[in-house]
Amino acid sequence: MYKRSLIAASLSVAALVSAQAMAEINGGGATLPQQLYQEPGVLTAGFAAYIGAGSGNGKAAFLNNDYTKFVAGTTNKNVHWAGSDSKLSKTNETNPYLSAHGSAWGPLIQVPSVATSVALPFNKSGSNAVNFADVNTLCGVFSGRLTDWSQIPGSGRSGAITVAYRSESSGTTELFTRFLNASCSSALEGGTFAITTSFGNSFSGGLPAGAVSAQGSQAVMNTLNAAEGRITYMSPDFAAPTLAGLDDATKVAQVRGVSPAPANVSAAIGAVTPPTTAQRSDPNNWVPVFAATASATDPSVRPYPTTGYPILGFTNLIFSQCYADATQTQQVRDFFTRHYGASVNNDTAITNHRFVPLPASWKLAVRQSFLTSTNNLYIGHSNVCNGIGRPL
């Protein structure tokens, strides 16, 4: 009798542990913020460890509930959220998702998480600061027009330049190619840069000769450090191990005399206003993107700032408004409460990882929209999520 009771109790505990494991909130995607999201305490209770897989894989995992985009061969887990530096395309991603899954899973939420620079670390010995005082020089390096370090004025270096880049669908690549698209002269470069998550497909003239690639932020940094003469574009969290490292222009290039340190993008980010109340029901309006000029039809498109470090953008969060499990619904609210809190929040961790916390006006807009029970955008709103939601 005792043995049967012990077995029954063991089975009950095993079932409970299994249910708890299944109930974890699974997410992953962009590697730019990977180390931030893996910092203890940034993700709140109930969240599984963040999996860095690239923005493209993160979006695909969420949009199709396909966990294999995070871990190949694992088909018994659901995807509950994603991180992406690449904004969801309203036409190609958000609208098809709502058509295919909206009735069963509910609307999606897309909001900026932190602001970021895109740094330009390089591996070329020398004591001079490397400064792309003229953006055309930067464009020439990444188009392949300029092939030797001696062609970068003031660098005090010579030898072949080798561009290292992300091989997979990367949101960091999208942030970088947005800048190149807006800033580079087609007449000078002999081609144009397309805004894309695939650097290999960006420049119409093809990749620079000898360019090398790797998958993920850390792998690209390893590739960069494997041989002299290499340069890449990178998350500030991976480009340098410390905040002071971002200001070391013998290892991380300046652009127009400015380093990619957070202080050099915070003023520009502070000038970006959140969507108006009337605009907030459209996920597209929540994520600002930069371009040569503002758009008359898309309020999320803002002109690049004229001061400070110019290569910047946001890394974003993608969640559902509705989850089938009430516990998960509350856990998602708890994370939003923490991450977008007015006083108790993740700002210290964000700053320590060389990112820029969202301004108070943005955090307030998120709380008003997704954490206020009388707002139709409220996470788990009974009128929207009645009997539907992403699966446990």
Swiss-Prot record:
Keywords: Hydrolase, Periplasm, Secreted, Signal. Changing A53V: In strain: MDR25. Induction: Strongly induced by phosphate limitation (150-fold for MDR25 smooth colonies, 1400-fold for MDR25 rough colonies and 5000-fold for MDR1). Highly expressed compared to the same gene in PA14, suppressed by inorganic phosphate, but less sensitive to phosphate than strain PA14. Its EC number is 3.1.3.1. SUPFAM superfamilies: Periplasmic binding protein-like II (SSF53850). It is an enzyme of class 3 (hydrolase). GO terms for molecular function: alkaline phosphatase activity. Pfam families: PBP_like_2 (PF12849). It is found in: Secreted; Periplasm. Residues 1-23 form the signal peptide. One of its GO terms (cellular component) is extracellular region. InterPro entries: PBP_domain, Phosphate-bind_PstS. It catalyses: a phosphate monoester + H2O = an alcohol + phosphate. The keyword ATP-binding does not apply. Belongs to the PstS family. Homodimer. Has both a phosphomonoesterase and phosphodiesterase activity. Protein and DNA sequence from strain MDR1 in. DNA sequence from MDR25 in. This is Alkaline phosphatase L. The gene is phoA2.
